[in-house]
UniProtKB/Swiss-Prot annotation:
InterPro entries noted in UniProt: EF-G-like_DII, EFG2, EFG_II, EFG_III, EFG_III/V, EFG_V, EFG_V-like, G_TR_CS
Species name: Aspergillus niger (strain ATCC MYA-4892 / CBS 513.88 / FGSC A1513)
Main location (coarse class): mitochondrion
Role summary: Mitochondrial GTPase that mediates the disassembly of ribosomes from messenger RNA at the termination of mitochondrial protein biosynthesis. Not involved in the GTP-dependent ribosomal translocation step during translation elongation.
BP term (GO), one: mitochondrial genome maintenance
Alphabetically ordered keywords of this record: GTP-binding, Mitochondrion, Nucleotide-binding, Protein biosynthesis, Transit peptide
Residue interval of the organelle targeting sequence: 1-17
Lineage, highest ranks first: Eukaryota, Fungi, Dikarya, Ascomycota, Pezizomycotina
tr-type G domain boundaries: 63-353
Signal sequence interval, chain numbering: none
Binding site for GTP: 72-79, 137-141, 191-194
Name used for this protein in its record: Ribosome-releasing factor 2, mitochondrial
GO molecular function, one term: GTPase activity
GO cellular component: mitochondrion
Pfam family, one: EFG_C
C-alpha cells in the first residue's frame, strides 16, 4: 500500500451516475465487501505544509527511494521547478533564479551565461523526511539529446513538464518516445498556467493525441472567480481546493468541497467532474478500482483517495497496453503547485525494487548460483565528468548490492580491475564523501582512470583478479550514441601544445561520447564532430576556457559521408614491420562493395564474424581455422599462433578495418553503406609468434585502404552522401502554408505528415517495439479536459479552427538546408515557430548537388 501524502479535506456525498461500461461486471466482481470509511471532517487545519511524514518507514530505505528525472522541451520550466523542489524540501534556503544565474543545478559557467541546461545534474533531497529523491535535471535543447539519453537509462520514473501556453512541443514528443523505449513511468506537470494564453484543457487534449496515452486529470487549475488570475489548483484525488498565499509558496490554504460550493461554485463542480472522470478512466484499466467503486455504492466521490492513488500507481506500472498519464497543474515561477507534484513523485512513481534491470535480473536468476552469491555490487557508469578540484568523477547507478569504498571494481566492458578510493554523494556541484553507495541509489566514484559512459562495473568477493563466470561477462544494456553530423577543425597554437590538446580532447570524449575526434592522416588536422552547432560551441568553450587548451576551433561544417558505387578488385596486403621493438608480420585480403542495410545480400555461410555498425558491414572469412568450442564455451583454434585467441583475432581485424573506413579515398569523409569482406588464409597470412594482434590490425587496415583506393583507380569510384534530417516543426495555422512551401521548394525537403505523431528513428532509441504502436489513436473529443477560461463550447470540445491553432509538420530535409533555419522560421511564423531535428539517414547526393557542395568545401574552386 502506498502511503498517501496528499492532504485530505472533508467532502460532500454526491451520487452521480454509475460506471458506463462496468454494470454487467458487478456480480462477477463481488460487490458485498465492506465499505472503507471516508475521511472525517475537520481532520486537517486550514493552513499547513503539504507534506506529512510517514513514520512507519525508515529513512532512505529502498522502497522509499525514487530515482527520477525532469524532462521537457527547452524553456518549459525544468530548472525553475527543480529549484522550488529543493527549496520546499529544505535542501536550500533560498530559491535559485535562472535569469540571475543563481540556480543549484545549472552550475556550469556556460549554463549560467546562456540560461539553459547543458549538463544533467544529479542531486539528492528528502520529501517527506523519510523518502529519498535522487533527481536529475536534464537539458531540453535538441543538441544535447545524448545527455538526456544517458540520464533516462538509469531512471525509474520521470516528470514531464509542459508549457501551458505552448502545449506539447516537438522536443517533448521526442524525449517522451525515448523514455517509452526504456518503459519509464511518467507523470505530467502542466506549468506556466499564470501566463497569458495558458490553456490547461487544450494541453490535456494534446497529451492524448500526441503522447499516445490517456490523460488522468488529477488536478484542475483554479482561476480566481472562474476567469481571473491563477491562484491554485482543485485536487480531484482528495476533493479539495489548494490556494497558495503570496510569497515563497510555503503557505497554502485548503478548502473542502462544502466551502468551495459557497465561495467558488464553478471550481467545486469542476473538481467533481474531474473526480468522476478519473474514477471512470481508472475503472476501464484496473479491475480493483471497479471493485472499490461498487463497494462505495457506485459513488465516484466516495472512493477513498488512497484507493485512487493505488490504482493510479498500478496503471503507471503496467508494461503492456496504452499508458495512463497522471496530470498535475501549477506555475513554478509563481511558487504554485510544486508541493503536490513532489507528493505525486513519492506516491505514484516506482522505487528501484519495482524496476530491476533486465540484464542483471537474467544473470542473477541463472544456474551459476555459486558465482552469483559472490556478487557484491553491480553498477552502470552513466556519466563521466572531469572536475577541476576532484579529478575524474564517474557517476554510477547501483543496480544490485552495495558499492563500498576501496572495493575492487571489475569493468566487464574493458576487462580491467580498478579500486574505488573515494565514493561521493553529489548535490549538484557539491559533494559529500560516503562509505558506500547502496542498491538503487545514484552516486559518484572518484579516482577511476579507465571507466567510460556505458560501462558495467561489478565488485565481488574473493582475491581473484577477475570475477567468476558469468559475472565477468555481465553487461547492462549500454547507452546508444547517436551519429555526429557537424564537425570543426581544432588547431593548436604551437606544436608544443599538440600533446596537451589531444589529452584535453580525450577528457572531453570520456565526458561526452557523442563527441568524436578524428585525425586526417595526410594533413595531420584534428577534427571534432558533434550533434549540432551549439553542441560544438559548448565543447569549444569547455576545451579552451575550462581545460585551458591553447587551440583555435575552425568553422563548423557538415559531416558528409562517402560510399562505393561498385565492387573493388580483390586486394591482398602484407604487413612486415617492427612494432614497439617487436617484429610483427601478418597478411590479409580485402574486397569492398556497396551495402544497403534494408536490402543486403546474404552473408557467406562460412563467415567467421559479421558485424554491422554505423551503416557499414564487416565480414571475416577464415575457413581453415578449424574453430572449436571448449567445455567453458570459449572458441579456440589450433591453427592460431600462440598467444592469439579467437576473440583478439576477430577484434584486431575488425578494428583495423574500421580505421580504414574512417577515411574515404576521394573526399576523405568516413565511409558509409560499405561492405568489407576480409579473408584470412592461415598458411599465407599467419606467421607464428610474429603475428601479433597489432600486426593483424595493421594488415587489415592496409588491405581495406588499398581496396578503397582501387575503387578510384580501376573501379567504379565513390559518391558523396549527406545527412537527411527528420525535422518536426511546431507553428500556428496562419504560418502553415508559408512553412510548407519553404520546406518543399526552397530547401529540397518533402513533407511526411501534418499533425501526426513523430515517427521513431534510429536516433530515438527505437531498439524495442513501442507498447502502443499498434493501438488506435485516441479521440481528443472523448477525453475529459476542463474548459479553459476563455474557451467557447462545452468541456472537451475540439480546438477551434483559428489562425492560432497549433500545427505540427514532420518533414525530411537535407541537413545543409537546415543550418541557420531557426532565424528563417521565426521570420515566416512571426516569431512563434520552433523545430527539432534528428538524423534520419545518409542519402546519396545527385551529381549537380555533389558538385555544388564540393565547390563550397574547396572555397569556391
Amino acid at each position: 500500500m502506498v502511503t498517501a501524502l496528499f492532504l485530505r479535506a472533508s467532502h460532500q456525498t454526491v451520487r452521480p451516475t454509475g460506471l458506463r461500461q462496468c454494470q454487467a461486471a458487478a456480480s462477477r466482481l463481488g460487490c458485498n465487501a465492506s465499505l472503507i470509511p471516508g475521511v472525517k471532517k475537520g481532520q486537517f487545519p486550514k493552513i499547513q505544509m503539504l507534506s506529512t511524514s510517514a513514520s512507519k518507514l525508515q529513512a532512505d530505505t529502498l522502497d522509499r527511494t525514487r530515482n527520477i528525472g525532469i524532462i521537457a522541451h527547452i524553456d518549459a520550466g525544468k530548472t525553475t521547478t527543480t529549484e522550488r523542489m529543493l527549496y520546499y524540501s529544505g535542501f536550500t534556503r533560498r530559491i535559485g533564479d535562472v535569469d540571475e544565474g543563481s540556480t543549484v543545478t545549472d552550475f556550469l559557467p556556460a549554463e549560467r551565461a546562456r540560461g539553459i541546461t547543458i549538463q544533467s545534474a544529479a542531486i539528492t533531497f528528502h520529501w517527506p523526511p523519510q523518502a529519498a529523491v535522487n533527481l536529475i535535471d536534464t537539458p531540453g535543447h535538441a543538441d544535447f539529446t545524448f545527455e538526456v539519453m544517458r540520464s533516462l537509462r538509469i531512471l525509474d520514473g520521470a516528470v514531464c513538464i509542459l508549457d501551458g501556453v505552448a502545449g506539447v512541443e516537438a522536443q517533448t514528443e521526442r524525449v517522451w518516445h525515448q523514455a517509452s523505449t526504456y518503459r519509464i513511468p511518467r507523470i505530467v506537470y502542466i506549468n506556466k498556467l499564470d501566463r497569458d494564453g495558458a490553456a490547461f484543457g487544450r494541453t490535456v487534449r494534446e497529451i492524448s493525441s500526441r503522447l499516445a496515452g490517456y490523460p488522468a486529470v488529477c488536478q484542475v487549475p483554479w482561476f480566481e472567480g472562474g476567469n481571473g488570475r491563477f491562484v491554485g489548483v482543485g485536487d480531484a484525488i482528495n476533493l479539495q481546493g489548494l490556494r497558495w498565499q503570496d510569497g515563497d509558496g510555503k503557505a497554502v490554504k485548503m478548502f473542502n468541497l462544502q466551502e468551495l460550493d459557497g465561495e467558488e461554485p464553478g471550481l467545486a463542480q469542476e473538481i467533481k467532474r474531474a473526480r468522476t472522470a478519473l474514477v471512470e478512466l481508472l475503472s476501464e484499466h484496473d479491475e480493483t478500482m471497479i471493485e472499490k467503486f461498487f463497494e462505495h455504492d457506485e459513488d465516484h466521490l466516495a472512493v477513498p483517495p488512497n484507493d485512487i492513488l493505488d490504482s493510479l500507481r498500478r496503471c503507471l506500472l503496467q508494461e503492456q497496453g496504452r499508458k495512463i498519464i497522471p496530470i498535475f497543474a501549477g506555475a513554478s515561477f509563481r511558487n504554485i503547485g510544486v508541493q503536490p507534484l513532489l507528493d505525486a513523485v513519492t506516491n505514484l512513481l516506482p522505487s528501484p525494487l519495482e524496476t530491476p534491470d533486465a540484464e542483471k535480473k537474467s544473470v542473477t536468476q541463472a544456474e551459476s548460483q555459486n558465482a552469483i552469491e559472490k556478487l557484491q555490487s553491480c553498477a552502470l557508469a552513466f556519466k563521466v565528468v572531469n572536475d577541476a578540484k576532484r579529478g575524474v568523477l564517474v557517476y554510477v547507478r547501483v543496480y544490485s548490492g552495495s558499492l563500498d569504498r576501496n572495493s575492487a571494481i571489475f569493468n566487464t566492458n574493458l576487462k580491467i580491475t580498478e579500486r574505488a578510493p573515494r565514493l561521493l554523494k553529489m548535490y549538484a556541484n557539491d559533494a559529500v564523501e560516503v562509505d558506500s553507495i547502496p542498491e538503487g541509489h545514484i552516486g559518484v566514484v572518484a579516482g577511476l582512470k579507465h571507466a567510460r559512459t556505458g560501462d558495467t562495473l561489478v565488485s565481488y568477493a574473493g582475491n581473484k583478479l577477475t570475477p567468476p563466470e558469468p559475472l565477468d561477462t555481465l553487461q547492462l544494456r549500454p547507452i546508444q550514441v547517436p551519429p555526429p553530423v557537424f564537425f570543426a577543425s581544432i588547431e593548436p597554437h604551437s606544436l608544443s601544445e599538440e600533446k596537451k590538446i589531444h589529452e584535453c580532447l580525450a577528457l572531453l570524449l570520456r565526458e561526452d561520447p557523442s563527441l568524436h575526434v578524428t585525425v586526417d592522416e595526410d594533413s595531420g588536422q584534428t577534427l571534432l564532430s558533434g550533434m549540432g552547432e551549439l553542441h560544438l560551441e559548448i565543447a569549444r568553450d569547455r576545451l579552451i576556457n575550462d581545460l585551458k587548451a591553447k587551440a583555435t576551433m575552425g568553422r563548423i561544417e557538415i559531416g558528409y559521408r562517402e560510399c562505393p558505387l561498385g565492387e573493388s578488385p580483390v586486394v591482398t596486403k602484407m604487413f612486415d614491420k617492427e612494432i614497439a621493438g617487436r617484429k610483427g608480420k601478418a597478411g590479409c585480403t580485402a574486397v569492398v562493395e556497396p551495402f544497403d542495410p534494408d536490402n543486403a545480400p546474404p552473408v557467406p555461410e562460412d563467415a567467421l564474424s559479421v558485424e554491422t555498425k554505423e551503416g557499414n558491414q564487416i565480414i571475416i572469412i577464415a575457413p581453415e581455422l578449424q574453430v572449436e568450442t571448449n567445455r567453458k564455451g570459449i572458441e579456440e583454434s589450433p591453427v592460431l599462433p600462440p598467444g592469439l585467441d579467437m576473440q583478439s583475432f576477430r577484434a584486431s581485424l575488425h578494428n583495423g578495418c574500421l580505421a580504414a573506413l574512417a577515411r574515404g579515398p576521394q573526399f576523405t569523409f568516413p565511409m558509409h553503406h560499405t561492405r568489407v569482406t576480409l579473408t584470412i588464409n592461415p598458411t599465407e597470412h599467419l606467421f607464428g609468434t610474429d603475428t601479433t594482434p597489432a600486426a593483424l590490425s595493421s594488415a587489415a587496415r592496409l588491405a581495406t585502404s588499398a581496396a578503397l583506393r582501387d575503387l578510384l583507380s580501376s573501379g567504379p569510384g565513390t559518391s558523396l552522401m549527406e545527412p537527411v534530417m527528420n525535422v518536426i516543426i511546431s507553428i500556428d495555422e496562419a504560418s502553415l502554408g508559408a512553412v510548407v512551401h519553404d520546406i518543399s521548394s526552397s530547401r529540397g525537403g518533402h513533407i511526411v505528415s501534418l499533425d501526426e505523431e513523430i515517427p521513431l528513428t534510429s536516433t530515438d532509441l527505437s531498439a524495442s517495439p513501442q507498447p502502443v504502436e499498434d493501438l488506435p489513436p485516441i479521440d481528443p473529443k472523448k477525453v475529459y479536459a476542463p474548459a479553459d477560461p476563455f474557451e467557447s463550447g462545452s468541456v472537451g470540445a475540439s480546438l477551434p479552427d483559428t489562425a492560432n491553432r497549433p500545427r505540427t509538420i514532420t518533414a525530411k530535409v537535407p541537413l545543409k538546408e537546415m543550418v541557420g533555419y531557426l532565424k528563417h522560421l521565426r521570420s515566416l511564423s512571426a516569431g512563434h515557430g520552433t523545430f527539432v531535428m534528428s538524423v534520419d539517414r545518409f542519402e546519396k547526393m545527385s551529381t549537380p548537388r555533389q558538385k555544388a557542395v564540393l565547390t563550397e568545401l574547396r572555397g569556391g574552386f
